[in-house]
Amino acid sequence: MKSSKVPHGRYSRLGALASLAGRVASNVAWEGAKQFAQGNRPSRKDLVMSPANIAHVADKLADLRGAAMKVGQLLSMDAGDLIPPELSDLLARLRNHATPMPSTQLNQVLTEQWGPEWKQDFTHFRFSPIASASIGQVHEAYTDAGDKVAVKVQYPRIKDSIDSDVDNVITLLRLSGLIPKDANYQALLDEAKQQLHDEADYRKEAKAMMRFNERLNAHTDLVVPNIHSTLTTDRVLTMDFMAGEPIETLTKAEPAVRHRAVSQLFTLLFEEVFVFGEVQTDPNFANYLYQPESGRIVLLDFGATRQYTSRFTEGYRKLFLAAIEKDNPGIDAALTQIGFFAEAILPEQKASVLELVNTACEPIATDAPFNFGQADLATRLRNRGMALSMEQGYWHTPPADALFLHRKIAGLYLLAAKLDVTLNVRALLMPYLTAERVKTA
């Protein structure tokens, strides 16, 4: 895998984005001239959305890493109803890929965090990363005590570039025409900034992992790696190395194995919302590893954990119960409690939102197995969301807490569809909808 130094100066990062904007513009002009010469009359959208332009955007965000890359990730997951499918699909590849930093830059970061003699704490340290993402990359190592560990190392000075990167990238995407100019992404962008600041605090993530490790300690099907506190800093996170296969590889497994894995993850979600009051909201499939020998799922990456109030979880308890009862006034009341509706919403817009919510709740609408593989749920939700925003002009963004919870739920829907699972989700959910199971803290 090729590596490249992470640009960390404000002007070098802004310059990279500016050059990308120029490249997109020149491609539009060149392709437009070529099409006109051939007698065609292409729309500006078609010129902007050319495969070459989209590929340039995705590649540049992967090189920049950090907030620039995270905006692409968030748009591909959260704004699928607003941006074209071609851009969403290409941005989606950013969820699992970033260009790693070279060994010299890696060594500099580790020396800053652990001191110049850091290698004495290890009998082996693999400098080539086993994974790379938006905030950092992961390395395999053996400590001098003989423990095999995974070391997550944050890219240099990424934290300093978060706010400006988010603003610069969204400006770039707007000016280039890759996203609608009149779409209101401000709430999403503010949350992207806050989430990135949280994810850049590895001590905070370590504490979240330790909480989940303790909560799931007696669980036979789910496991969270132990943290090595003495080798963890604000920018380096060290944990037990846990082997496993990407959960997507279960597409080749027996139906019972796929069913069990997805059941475990839905049950965990309901436990997080209604018992823990804290949810790991990142839906990235790479956060799950499957261990075939034991059937356990390893849970990774807790940088995007969010804590929820009892009022919020009570709102979702009411929402799910109303959806099960097909009680639209109850759904309306629950969504209002959650803070879902804008004050200026029109009656026809509210009706469309209720229809959208009922579609999203189809897996719990009946007390029977739901066929995720055949339901085409993601496409129908995208189409309804697109109609609501583009045709009816309803741009209101739900509260951040709801937005990130919806990402997690949507991620499980996508995983269940990918693994072609048929599952009675209502049966898993119902025990958590009784008042005594809801978080009271």
Regions found by a protein language model. Give the residues of each.
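Broad phosphate/nucleotide-binding scaffolds in NTP-utilizing and phosphate-metabolizing enzymes
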Residues: 1-270, 277, 290-298, 302-310, ...
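Short helix-adjacent coil turns
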Residues: 326-327
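Short amphipathic alpha-helical recognition elements used for nucleic-acid or partner binding
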Residues: 315-318
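Catalytic-loop of the protein kinase fold
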Residues: 275-285
